[in-house]
UniProtKB/Swiss-Prot annotation:
Protein name as it appears in the record: Heat-inducible transcription repressor HrcA
Entry GO MF terms: DNA binding
PANTHER family, per database record: HEAT-INDUCIBLE TRANSCRIPTION REPRESSOR HRCA
Domain of life, per lineage: Bacteria
UniProt keyword list: Repressor, Stress response, Transcription, Transcription regulation
Function: Negative regulator of class I heat shock genes (grpE-dnaK-dnaJ and groELS operons). Prevents heat-shock induction of these operons.
Segments crossing the lipid bilayer: none
InterPro entries linked to this entry: GAF-like_dom_sf, HrcA, HrcA_C, WH-like_DNA-bd_sf, WH_DNA-bd_sf, WHTH_transcript_rep_HrcA_IDD
Amino acid sequence: MGSRELNLRERQVLGIIIQLYVVTAAPVGSRYIARNYSLGLSDATIRNVMADLEAEGYISQPHTSAGRIPTDLGYRYYVDLIMKVQRIDEEEKRRMESDFGPISMEGRGTSAEVLVSAAKVLGSISRQLSVVLSPTLSNAVFEKLDMVLLSSTRMMVVLSIQSMFVKTIVMELQHELTRQKVDEVVDLLNERLSGLTLSEIRRSITRRLAGSSCDTNLKDLIVRSADSLFDESPIFERLYISGAEYIVEQPEFKQPERVRELITMIEDKFSVARLVEDIAPKQDLKRTAGHDVSISIGRENSALQAEDLTIVSAPYYAGSMVGTLGILGPKRMDYEHAVRVLNYMADCLTATLSDVN
């Protein structure tokens, strides 16, 4: 099924069916296409074209309708070979910049605030569920560290990483420490580790801290904890979600059971993060407007609960680090619009997070 390249008529009819279905959520009939589109084809000819498309698995007929709707295969052919992505229009561009700009201009706000803002703007503009994954930290460059004594036996370690990113971890102390001893270790760590990537620090911290006269107990604790301290945060802690109020308005989620299933999935942050991250390395990327945009449709998704959804994702950059933006919605999605706004938000995030390096 779907092994050959479609001819011009078939491509035109498939494109029209998908574009109409995206807007109306109603099956599309041959008579409507013949009357409203100047294809130079009769109703009977269009009906025959639709029969061929159905036979090859690109469209299907709901039991209660004479019209046709796209299948996963039809959507896949559309996004790979028919869809044309235009530049974002000026009105939408101004709206995104006005909503995202205040938190991002001139490096104002923390990295978390910037990513929360990006998720909100992306959800509002796309009218779908938006997901922002903060960058993985393996190649992140360590800038400085500080230690805050919470009590005589507890302290919080704050790592400042390139592009405004911060990681914190609370550590239990086996021995009481003075502020002076803590400051000596902080100075040592910043002097010997600043400018290294987190992966380099994990591999070489023992050697790099050797020969110092700082507090041995605290220094040894830092070395023993290096794999957690200078490592990735759990994936669900890197996730920012917005737009649930928009996706539940879609006709696909009118039934209460469907809404419950969707909300359950959204609340499982680990699963949502994995869904978006899992499609990023795929080889069948849709290359558009300078971005590697990955589109995973229906049963292409790794999770059973996402078989009725489409996930569109794109990378953004913060120095040497790479994060992921995503839009989740029903398969009946405006794909061209989703790719367009995702591309532009990726540009905005990359510019914002690069400006502070």
